[in-house]
């Protein structure tokens, strides 16, 4: 009888719900949607020792798509942990989760907390997730759903770009110049910079409704001035009109590049001596073109930025960044991103596997920012 009682105590007292995840075992650079499949399973880890998370929402980011294509430098390990025939990984790097249960003795988290993963490659395109270490999760209680789902990539990237490379003098006439001014990161950059007393010159593509878009970027998102790519590449504009826009004693100290090609060289030319250009993306798929004279005679520093690698080197920096952003959202200094997001609903109770897969595929193939929101 004693042995039987001992056996009962050792058995798990909790059971996992059925997990459903979007997995991939291979890659396809031509059509990454073909490698995704929906798979249901029960985790192999012990329920009593694991933190159980219920997914609330996850975005579809360019880095997620690049991982499916097999062209991203950071990828999760494919394993047999999900009871698949071939080693597989769960797609997705970002999302917000609700804590459903915690192991006995866990004091850092409580049931009902909203959390996000500290690191990439955790597999967020799923209805449930388990975690063994509460230290790899960051609490984001108090944020709205869309901010919480996207703060780890776009929010942290924008904040660190503005704050980690230049010591700003808010009493001076100091500027950031950036291309891709309509991107989610750029919109946060202008708001973070405005809160720091730093001005921003945002470059956007030429378009028929340029004036309308520029007005929104300036009035809603805090850009000091918006110009077109044509103006950005026009030497006469830079010589005659740009000084008037910048004002007296202006210092363009930082350039943020996520386009590459001609656009990157044009924003680099606007920097003061010993200025810094940070490249964090390459939308044009063209190489960064920086004039040799800027490097030799102007002391230009051209650096790369990658939030994934920064977090690996210094995890606390991301935790601190999230805390700072949460304070800014709480103080009303940052606009929630919901207005710029395409919502995709995953009705957990009603949608079958085919419907879920089709919805996510549509999100991958659509323009703009898509966030999958789970309806429980």
UniProtKB/Swiss-Prot annotation:
One of its GO terms (biological process) is fatty acid metabolic process. Its EC number is 1.3.1.104. NADP(+) binds at residues 154, 182-185, 205-207, 280-283, 305-307, 369. GO terms for cellular component: mitochondrial matrix; mitochondrion. SUPFAM superfamilies: GroES-like (SSF50129), NAD(P)-binding Rossmann-fold domains (SSF51735). CDD domains: ETR (cd08290). Belongs to the zinc-containing alcohol dehydrogenase family. Quinone oxidoreductase subfamily. Pfam families: ADH_N. It is an enzyme of class 1 (oxidoreductase). Its main location: mitochondrion. The keyword Mitochondrion applies. Catalyzes the NADPH-dependent reduction of trans-2-enoyl thioesters in mitochondrial fatty acid synthesis (fatty acid synthesis type II). Fatty acid chain elongation in mitochondria uses acyl carrier protein (ACP) as an acyl group carrier, but the enzyme accepts both ACP and CoA thioesters as substrates in vitro. Required for respiration and the maintenance of the mitochondrial compartment. One of its GO terms (molecular function) is enoyl-[acyl-carrier-protein] reductase (NADPH) activity. Keywords: Fatty acid biosynthesis, Fatty acid metabolism, Lipid biosynthesis, Lipid metabolism, Mitochondrion, NADP, Oxidoreductase, Transit peptide. This is Enoyl-[acyl-carrier-protein] reductase, mitochondrial. Homodimer. It comes from the Eukaryota. It is found in: Mitochondrion matrix. The gene is ETR1. It catalyses: a 2,3-saturated acyl-[ACP] + NADP(+) = a (2E)-enoyl-[ACP] + NADPH + H(+). The active site is at 72 (proton donor). Signal peptide: none annotated.
């Amino acid at each position: 009888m004693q042995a039987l009682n001992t056996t009962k105590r050792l058995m798990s007292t909790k059971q996992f719900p059925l997990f459903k995840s979007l997995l991939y075992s291979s890659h396809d650079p031509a059509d990454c949607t073909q490698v995704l499949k929906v798979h249901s399973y029960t985790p192999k880890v012990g329920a009593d020792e694991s933190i159980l998370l219920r997914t609330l929402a996850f975005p579809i980011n360019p880095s997620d798509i690049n991982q499916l294509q097999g062209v991203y430098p950071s990828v999760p390990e494919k394993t047999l942990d999900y009871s698949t025939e071939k080693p597989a990984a769960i797609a997705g790097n970002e999302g917000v989760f609700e804590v459903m249960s915690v192991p006995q003795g866990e004091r850092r988290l409580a049931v009902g907390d909203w959390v996000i993963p500290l690191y990439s490659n955790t597999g967020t395109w799923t209805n449930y997730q388990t975690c063994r270490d509460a230290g790899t999760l960051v609490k984001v209680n108090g944020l709205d759903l869309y901010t919480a789902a996207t703060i780890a990539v776009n929010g942290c990237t924008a904040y660190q770009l503005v704050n980690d490379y230049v010591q700003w003098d808010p009493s001076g006439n100091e500027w950031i110049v950036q291309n891709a001014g309509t991107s989610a990161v750029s919109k946060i950059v202008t708001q973070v910079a405005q809160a720091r007393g730093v001005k921003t010159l945002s470059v956007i593509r030429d378009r028929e409704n340029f004036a309308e878009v520029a007005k929104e970027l300036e009035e809603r998102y805090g850009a000091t001035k918006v110009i077109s790519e044509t103006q950005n590449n026009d030497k006469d504009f830079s010589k005659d009109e740009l000084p008037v826009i910048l004002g007296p004693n202006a210092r363009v100290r930082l350039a943020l590049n996520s386009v590459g090609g001609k656009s990157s060289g044009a924003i680099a030319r606007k920097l003061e001596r010993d200025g810094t250009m940070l490249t964090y993306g390459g939308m044009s798929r063209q190489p960064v073109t920086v004039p040799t004279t800027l490097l030799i005679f102007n002391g230009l520093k051209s650096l790369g930025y990658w939030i994934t690698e920064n977090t690996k080197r210094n995890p606390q920096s991301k935790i601190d960044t999230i805390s700072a952003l949460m304070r800014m959202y709480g103080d009303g200094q940052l606009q929630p991103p919901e207005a710029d997001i395409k919502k995709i609903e995953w009705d957990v109770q009603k949608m079958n596997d085919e419907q879920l897969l089709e919805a996510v595929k549509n999100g991958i193939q659509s323009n703009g920012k898509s966030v999958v929101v789970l309806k429980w």
